[in-house]
Amino acid sequence: MDNPLVILLVEDDVLVRMVAADVLEDAGFTVLESTNAEEALRLLETRPDVQVLFTDVNMPGALDGLGLAQTVHERTPGVGILIGSGRVRPDPGELPPGTRFIAKPYASSALTDAVRAVARGQQGRGEHSMTSG
């Protein structure tokens, strides 16, 4: 049997993060959780098995979800990116190439389908390696 996909979930709202993590874990994914972009970047440095980043747009700290997505795209091109928001719908030009967007609130099946689609887009790229930006 294949190893489960490893998802890094970045969401500052604890309830939203808990629900999303439960949905993803119930779908068979391994979920790592982070509350902000800085913590997520530290996790990526130590977890080369992360295959998909799923991040909220609006988060506290110096880097929001769009900034995190761009940084991850530049430093870890083997990681697929999914961005979610209930307040902001980014223009396609604001997103790194290959990034998908999902609007909140999202159905459980829509979330798992989006994660699988992002992961499929990354197949063949292997494990990521963090490069300094």
Mark where each language-model region is.
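Hydrophobic/aromatic residues positioned on beta-strands within the core alpha/beta folds
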Residues: 82-85
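Acidic, metal-coordinating helix/loop segments flanking the phosphotransfer/catalytic sites
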Residues: 33-52, 92
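Charged docking surfaces used in two-component/phosphorelay signaling
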Residues: 18-26
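C-terminal output helix
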Residues: 106-119, 123-127
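Short amphipathic alpha-helix used as the core "switch/output" element in two-component signaling
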Residues: 66-78
